[in-house]
């Protein structure tokens, strides 16, 4: 059963969905169950995928990776998300954009997540 904020992807057509309200059932696309995109927190590519969270005067700045992630036509960050106090904030990106987002919110604890079109879903907490 899917849980709130989980990300699923169709292995056939590439559709991606985020669960906003967890119901009772499986997510199906193109006649097959969708694949849960587990959140990576570290691996050999950590310097390019794990979000870096910085507290700012106005809220939080999230940069993808301690080394700038490529933002090319074939390899880019599709979105950056910040979850704070049960609320999800997103910035959608496109090739050529900077792999970063600023969120003007007040919260003590946040989770940053991002999605790379080639390497999947990544997260960090602060």
From Swiss-Prot:
Is the keyword Nucleotide-binding in the record? no
The free-text cofactor remark is: Binds 1 Fe(3+) ion per subunit. The iron ion 1 is coordinated via 4 cysteine residues. Binds 1 Fe(2+) ion per subunit. The iron ion 2 is coordinated via four histidines and one cysteine residue.
Give the cofactors, semicolon-separated. Answer: Fe(3+); Cu(2+)
- InterPro entries tied to this protein: Desulfoferrodoxin_Fe-bd_dom, Desulfoferrodoxin_Fe-bd_dom_sf, Desulfoferrodoxin_N, Desulfoferrodoxin_N_sf, Desulfoferrodoxin_rbo, Desulfoferrodoxin_SOR
Keyword Iron annotated: yes
Query: What are the alphabetically sorted keywords of the record?
Result: Detoxification, Electron transport, Iron, Metal-binding, Oxidoreductase, Transport
Which EC numbers does the record give? 1.15.1.2
Database matches in CDD domains = DSRD, SORL_Dfx_classI
Q: Which GO terms describe its molecular function?
A: iron ion binding; superoxide reductase activity
- Residue positions annotated to bind Fe cation 1 are 10, 13, 29-30
Catalytic activity as recorded in UniProt: reduced [rubredoxin] + superoxide + 2 H(+) = oxidized [rubredoxin] + H2O2
Q: Where does Fe cation 2 bind?
A: 49, 69, 75, 116, 119
Q: What does this protein do?
A: Catalyzes the one-electron reduction of superoxide anion radical to hydrogen peroxide at a nonheme ferrous iron center. Plays a fundamental role in case of oxidative stress via its superoxide detoxification activity.
**PANTHER family named among the record's database cross-references:** SUPEROXIDE REDUCTASE-RELATED
Please share what else the UniProt entry notes about this protein.
Answer: Catalysis occurs at center II. Fe(2+) ion of center II is the electron donor and is converted to the Fe(3+) form during the reaction.
NCBIfam families the record matches: desulf_FeS4 (TIGR00319), dfx_rbo (TIGR00320), neela_ferrous (TIGR00332)
* Family note: Belongs to the desulfoferrodoxin family.
The name this protein carries in UniProt is Desulfoferrodoxin
Protein species of origin:
Nitratidesulfovibrio vulgaris (strain ATCC 29579 / DSM 644 / CCUG 34227 / NCIMB 8303 / VKM B-1760 / Hildenborough) (Desulfovibrio vulgaris)
Question: Which gene is transcribed and translated to give this protein?
Answer: dfx
């Amino acid at each position: 059963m899917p849980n709130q904020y989980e990300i699923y992807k169709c292995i056939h057509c590439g559709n991606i969905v985020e669960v906003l309200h967890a119901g009772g059932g499986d997510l199906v696309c193109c006649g097959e169950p969708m694949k849960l995109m587990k959140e990576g927190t570290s691996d050999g590519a950590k310097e390019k995928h794990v979000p870096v969270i910085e507290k700012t005067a106005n809220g939080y700045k999230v940069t993808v990776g301690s080394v700038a992630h490529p933002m090319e036509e074939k390899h880019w960050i599709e979105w950056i998300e910040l979850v704070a106090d049960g609320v999800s904030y997103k910035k959608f990106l496109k090739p050529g954009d900077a792999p970063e987002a600023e969120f003007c919110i007040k919260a003590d604890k946040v989770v940053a997540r991002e999605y790379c079109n080639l390497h999947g879903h990544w997260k960090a907490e602060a």
